[in-house]
Amino acid sequence: MIASAPGKIILFGEHAVVYGRHAVVSAINLRCRVSVRKSDRFLIRSSLGESGLDYQRHPYVVQAVKRFGELRNIPGAEIEIESEIPIGSGLGSSAAVIVATIAALNAEFDGDMDKEAIFQMAKQVEIDVQGRASGIDPFISTFGGSWLFPERRKVEMPFKFFVINFGSRSTAEMVAKVAELRERHPEVVDKIFDAIDAISLEASDVGSAERLEELIAINQSLLRAIGVSNPEIDRTIAELERMGLNAKITGAGGGGCIFGLFKGEKPKGSFIVEPEKEGVRIEE
């Protein structure tokens, strides 16, 4: 059986959401596809290579197999992974492979998991591997759509976005950097988080592309203020602004991706994504 699950883009609220503020997050039309076939042994194939249940090479897939194995006896499986989502970019590649793996295992081994059960298991796998997790990524990958968190209220997001990928970065490092800044200047940083919170709430009900673009620019200025941008990102955003395009970091920052509203002309080095209404699904 083959299952696929979408990646995600944090539109507004990164970092602030860690401290109880709101975030707007959308599934995107880039998918991870996982094929599972019954076998007498375990074999995993992906862009990272071929292995058995090798945790070092395929931690999320191996842990998903182990968790699913607590529900159903699995003597072996051939698992093949193909993904359109750039790894380590902040676009939800890890959650997508977890969710798609669990859904494909469930279909191939005649499980009875619904989407809520798939999400709960995927969230647990994410915690197993990362130590802690908000659950936002596996939720988006499972259910699709655009949402306001933490309420999990569906929002309308009828826009396409350009995305520029600056390569992988350490989420933990960026989160720690912001935490240290907040320790030194708690009142200042909390006021910045409050402003980001207001942006997320306004963006969840935004009606026009013009207003959304303004919020993108304001949010990026606040992310720069808490130290999660870098000179390369700043230069690129400045170049885009000269072209009449606003852009902001999505995710942890320090690398990863930036995005902006797609107006018909694709900026150099970018790719185009759009919100994806459908979450995990069985392909065949």
UniProtKB/Swiss-Prot annotation:
Gene Ontology CC entries for this record: cytosol
Single Gene Ontology BP annotation: isopentenyl diphosphate biosynthetic process, mevalonate pathway
Recorded catalytic activity of this chain's protein: (R)-mevalonate + ATP = (R)-5-phosphomevalonate + ADP + H(+)
EC number: 2.7.1.36
Active site, UniProt feature: D137 (proton acceptor)
InterPro entries in the record: GHMP_kinase_C_dom (IPR013750), GHMP_kinase_C_sf (IPR036554), GHMP_kinase_N_dom (IPR006204), GHMP_knse_ATP-bd_CS (IPR006203), Mev_gal_kin (IPR006205), Mevalonate_kinase_arc (IPR022937), Ribosomal_Su5_D2-typ_SF (IPR020568), Ribsml_uS5_D2-typ_fold_subgr (IPR014721)
UniProt pathway: Isoprenoid biosynthesis; isopentenyl diphosphate biosynthesis via mevalonate pathway; isopentenyl diphosphate from (R)-mevalonate: step 1/3
PROSITE patterns with a match to the protein in the record: GHMP_KINASES_ATP (PS00627)
Presence of the UniProt keyword Phosphoprotein in the record: no
Entry keyword set: ATP-binding, Cytoplasm, Isoprene biosynthesis, Kinase, Lipid biosynthesis, Lipid metabolism, Magnesium, Nucleotide-binding, Transferase
Main location as per UniProt: cytoplasm
Location within or outside the cell: Cytoplasm
EC supergroup of this enzyme: transferase
Binding-site positions, ATP: P86, I87, G88, S89, G90, L91, G92, S93, S94, A95, A96
Cofactor: Mg(2+)
GO molecular function, one term: ATP binding
Keyword Repressor set for record: no
UniProt xrefs under NCBIfam families: mevalon_kin (TIGR00549)
Quaternary structure note: Homodimer.
Record function comment: Catalyzes the phosphorylation of (R)-mevalonate (MVA) to (R)-mevalonate 5-phosphate (MVAP). Functions in the mevalonate (MVA) pathway leading to isopentenyl diphosphate (IPP), a key precursor for the biosynthesis of isoprenoid compounds such as archaeal membrane lipids.
PANTHER family: MEVALONATE KINASE (PTHR43290:SF2)
Family: Belongs to the GHMP kinase family. Mevalonate kinase subfamily.
Listed name of the protein: Mevalonate kinase
Taxonomic lineage: Archaea, Methanobacteriati, Methanobacteriota, Archaeoglobi, Archaeoglobales
